[in-house]
């Protein structure tokens, strides 16, 4: 029980920090809604980042290090990760072969792979409730809380988005979350991202 409380507390902190806006006075936002809001923000930012980067920059990586991924490989890697985590959430095999999307090279293929991954995840995320977030589900050879898998999906996605931002800025492309938009930290948008 202590572990479940710690997991829930950690997820609540993560979800609240990841949400784009604080709730209005008197509004109560539960765990599932917080995670769903964070997912929607991640989906918007990553989708826009994939669409906004010019095709010529999909082969870009900031150094010749063979261990670094190109921009396109990061987009494919994120799609692969989403398929894996959302297959776990749904209790089904991943419809995408391991690292299959990371091997794609054209912008069109990678944008589609990311869109397909989000479409696959959308149902799992909309089915999330405060109650089932605590349920243990099969992951690998063991079990973990459904909310823990969602947390892994979000944290990996936020990491991938952060990396994409660095690549975009290196190529002179303003990342999505830096643009002024309603609900993004006010009329000036979120600066410094």
Annotate each predicted stretch with a short phrase.
Residues 21-27, 102, 179-193:
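Disordered, low-complexity segments in secreted/periplasmic proteins that are enriched in proline
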Residues 51-59, 124-134, 169-175:
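Surface-exposed helix-capping loop/turn segments at secondary-structure junctions
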Residues 22-29, 89-103:
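Acidic/histidine-rich, surface-exposed loop or edge segments in extracytoplasmic proteins
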Residues 102-138, 144-160:
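Acidic/histidine-rich alpha-helical segments that form the ligand environment
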Residues 6-17:
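Bacterial N-terminal signal peptides
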Residues 22-44:
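Short N-terminal segments immediately surrounding and downstream of signal-peptide cleavage
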Residues 36, 40-47, 58-99, 138-183, ...:
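Short, contiguous alpha-helical
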Residues 1-4:
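Positively charged n-region of N-terminal signal peptides that target proteins for export
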